[in-house]
Amino acid sequence: MKISIISDAHLGFSPVEKLEEDSYENFEEAFTKALDSDLIILAGDLFDSRAPKTKAWAYALKILSKATLQENRGVKLVEIDKQLKEASKKTLEHLPVIAIHGNHELRAKGEINAIEALENAGLLIYLNMNKVVFEKNGEKVAIFGLSHVPERFAKDVLDKWDPRPLEDCFNILLLHQNIDPFVYSPLEQPTLNISNLPRGFDLIVDGHIHVSTQEKIDNTIFIIPGSTVITQFQASEAQNPKGFFKIDTKLKKVEFVEINARKFFYETIEISREQNAREIIERKIREKIFGNFKKQPIVKIRITGNAMISEKDLRELERKYQDSCILFFTKSLESTELTQKLEFLRSLKESRVSLQEIGLNILKKSLDELNFKNSFDFVDIFNLLADEEVDTALNILLGQQKTLRMVK
């Protein structure tokens, strides 16, 4: 069976206006190139927000509907361990799409997330601690999917679920987590690592990490598709292409398919106080933008050393070259104290951790410092605060209320 695996499209991601279309165009290219497959797997973070804007929804519906226009290539559903929604049968009649949710789509327990909504529309089959088995020409493929959970719970949840490969199947385990040594978020250390992943699977797929990787763990193929759009603006993204994986399950052959993502340059320049900082930076910019580009390239320059260059100068450079490239600057100051204070915020910004995940961890840290007992789910408290139900959250914290419903 031929399967395409796409991850982290982050539809709706737009740090600046010029980059607004990139997430849509890149995902559409990847998905279109995957239409020659028997199955398509989406490994989380299809959207950039847990409450996607209308434009992101419009593109998701437009792009995913392409699978419903394809003829089924003889792929049949053999088994699924969840109640299959009537609408989901629509995707089985054409090119089946299987998906899990990522951390950017995580919602409170009991709420419908964006991936579930797409399942309700008949565009995909959503897995969360579920397995589904397909068959084509006598060959069976079993897909076990665990959607994203907070990192501190990942190992316990995976152990409790205890997915076990099926006999006479090509077995795939689908995750969206930090896995040591592939650490993504600076907020929480992973509880999963290469050595404690379930054994016996033919293929393990992990979303969440934005740089593509292919490894071998014993007899298991381990792949990280990476994101289809540049979001972190880190050196690793400049060094690795964007795209997705295709796998032939019969031959156990894996192929990385590159897409035409916007060119991204990352440069570190060390400048001393005696040098002309602006002149050196400008020379580097001109060097990078020399050439023919389909889209304006992104150029990120990290400035180190003790050179004196003002924010005003950097903003002027951004304006000067705005018709040639998209410029980002970051400065590593020599003041140790200030550098330490900025390091955490910079790592958050560059890692593209969702605002929800940042807020959840800050809330948990604060509650731990106040010695609150675990008599409530702090994720529910966070969502109440996010929905401006402050009184309900306070009543639960004080033990005056046990339910999440507003007391009247």
Feature map (PLM): residue ranges:
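Accessory, non-catalytic peripheral segments of nucleic-acid enzymes
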Residues: 251-408
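Divalent metal-dependent phosphoesterase catalytic cores across multiple superfamilies
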Residues: 22-35, 64
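Acidic/histidine-rich helix-loop elements
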Residues: 11-24
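Active-site metal-binding motif and surrounding structural segment of the metallo-beta-lactamase
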Residues: 32-45
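His/Asp/Glu-rich metal-coordinating catalytic cores
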Residues: 22, 39, 48-245
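Extreme N-terminal starter segment of soluble prokaryotic enzymes
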Residues: 1-4
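Short N-terminal binding/cap micro-motifs at the start of the first secondary-structure element
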Residues: 12-15, 153, 310
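Short polar catalytic/cofactor-binding loops
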Residues: 7-13, 338-339
